[in-house]
């Protein structure tokens, strides 16, 4: 039977904090990514070998996407957005592994990621414009728009969370249902589709985060 996507399996407590299966899966993914990054970035050279050339190509591609949207130097935003898309790709695709639930298929992980984006948007906005200038941007183009602009900040964060959660959760639910009804090998084409959906959702989430940051720093229109 499929468990509710709004509830997670409780594993243990650290003090008053409940540690659930998606939390542990997230920790494992973070540790694995840290080890991989440590390994692949050792012994970087002026003349890159194939591994380094591939890494530089990925970084350049992500930086190019950021600059296309924000129209500013990508370096201040690259650590956040680059980490975000790498984590999302791995987290979304982890559900393909037997016995592993993608942490993004449970509501707490998309909610946490959306909150990270929410606070990062305001951080970059204040850093770029100053506190007064950034707060004044909520009254643009007219003061009457202030409540709507504040509401927009909240609703777009909520939609960012729901979009990621809904797409990944529904993919896992459908595959689990087909496995229960038809056997192990039938859902293989659906798993390929889930991989595609996971990659697309990682890209969309990161692009939307980039757009929100661009709006905060004044590079793209708010909306």
UniProtKB/Swiss-Prot annotation:
GO MF annotation terms: proton-transporting ATP synthase activity, rotational mechanism
Function: Key component of the proton channel; it plays a direct role in the translocation of protons across the membrane.
Quaternary data: F-type ATPases have 2 components, CF(1) - the catalytic core - and CF(0) - the membrane proton channel. CF(1) has five subunits: alpha(3), beta(3), gamma(1), delta(1), epsilon(1). CF(0) has four main subunits: a, b, b' and c.
PANTHER family from the UniProt entry: ATP SYNTHASE SUBUNIT A, CHLOROPLASTIC
Similarity section: Belongs to the ATPase A chain family.
Transmembrane residue ranges: 17-37, 77-97, 106-126, 173-193, 195-215
Domain of life: Bacteria
Keyword Cell inner membrane: yes
UniProt keywords, alphabetically: ATP synthesis, Cell inner membrane, Cell membrane, CF(0), Hydrogen ion transport, Ion transport, Membrane, Transmembrane, Transmembrane helix, Transport
Gene name in the database record: atpB2
One Pfam family matching this protein: ATP-synt_A
GO biological process, one term: proton motive force-driven plasma membrane ATP synthesis
Protein topology in the membrane: Multi-pass membrane protein
Intracellular or extracellular location(s): Cell inner membrane
Name of the protein this chain belongs to: ATP synthase subunit a 2
Gene Ontology, cellular component aspect: plasma membrane; proton-transporting ATP synthase complex
